[in-house]
């Protein structure tokens, strides 16, 4: 079986290597902002579907229009594998992060697994990860034990987060203690870990706003401290099971998926505008992509069109995903 690094992951590793091929002053080192959606297909993005599907994503399109739009970009078939491959630059067979991470699972990033945050630290970068992690349940697997200075986010897919609110979930406190999901975690590289409370169905409506604001705050602090930054912002949109606030529910007239994508795009616009406001847009690499293909397949959502298959399959629709990179 071929266990080589995926083509897209190689590109990231090569880009980082080229970035530091020469010795540069700290002020010359570009900031790096990577934004991941969740379960997003190429035709969920209007830069790809050009009006052939429902919904519009002007801010994601802006990254593509001001940079490069990738049409042959591969991730993995599921959340944990796709995120592990990106942040480590390794095939998930090497890390063992092949399946979906669940509450209570003992699998996660190991000390020997490199991360982009660890590789950037010797070059003076501060690194923050915000939003969905899905790379391990235990404290030892948190991003702040793998090169990141700060993490604020959730640890699993949304289905797992809302299970305690379902009628069939066991009522036993012992069961919940062993197998229940942790809340939204705020942790730091110095060992501080705070559980800010469960990611309930209600909180899911605005969780991405929390993660967006935390990322913006981290960027502002890095600029104030005159430090180059690496920020990985992982939205929960547009997971196939999600919860929309009244503000976004029905926004597009094309259903839940398009409404959620509209909110996702809006949040990205706020972050892009912040880069402009801080005067750092021209010195910031912005990457947009996702972990795996979509689960919604056809009009009006777009999803995996024009490819066969969906998330969790080995057809193109399962792992061929949108990607755009801007570096003015």
Where are these regions (language model features)?
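Formylglycine-dependent sulfatase
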Residues: 2, 14-328
């Amino acid at each position: 079986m071929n266990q080589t690094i995926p083509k897209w992951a190689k590109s990231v590793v090569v880009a980082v290597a080229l970035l530091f091929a020469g010795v540069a002053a700290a002020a010359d080192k570009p900031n790096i902002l990577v934004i991941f959606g969740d379960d997003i297909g190429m035709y969920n993005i209007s830069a790809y579907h050009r009006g052939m599907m429902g919904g519009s994503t002007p801010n994601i399109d802006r990254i593509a229009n001001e940079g490069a739009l990738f049409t042959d970009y591969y991730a993995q078939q599921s959340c944990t594998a796709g995120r592990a491959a990106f942040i480590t630059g390794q095939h998930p067979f090497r890390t063992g992060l092949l399946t979906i991470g669940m509450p209570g699972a003992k699998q996660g990033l190991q000390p020997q697994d490199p991360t982009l945050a660890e590789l950037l630290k010797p070059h003076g970068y501060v690194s923050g990860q915000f939003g969905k992690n899905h790379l391990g349940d235990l404290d030892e697997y948190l991003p702040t034990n793998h090169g990141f200075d700060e993490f604020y986010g959730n640890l699993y897919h949304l289905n797992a987060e809302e299970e305690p609110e379902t009628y069939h979930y066991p009522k036993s406190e012992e069961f919940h203690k062993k197998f229940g999901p942790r809340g939204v975690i705020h942790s730091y590289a110095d060992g501080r870990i705070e559980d800010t409370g469960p990611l309930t169905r209600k909180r899911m409506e605005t969780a991405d706003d929390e993660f967006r604001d935390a990322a913006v705050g981290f960027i502002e602090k890095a600029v104030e401290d005159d430090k180059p930054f690496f920020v990985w912002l992982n939205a929960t949109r547009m997971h196939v099971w999600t919860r929309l606030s009244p503000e976004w529910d029905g926004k597009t007239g094309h259903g839940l998926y398009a409404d959620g994508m509209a909110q996702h795009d809006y949040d990205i616009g706020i972050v892009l505008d912040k880069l402009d406001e801080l005067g750092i847009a021209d010195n910031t690499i912005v990457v947009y992509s996702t972990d795996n293909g979509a689960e919604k397949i056809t009009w009006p959502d777009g999803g995996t069109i024009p490819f066969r298959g969906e998330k969790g399959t080995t057809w193109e629709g399962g792992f061929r995903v949108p990607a755009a990179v801007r570096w003015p």
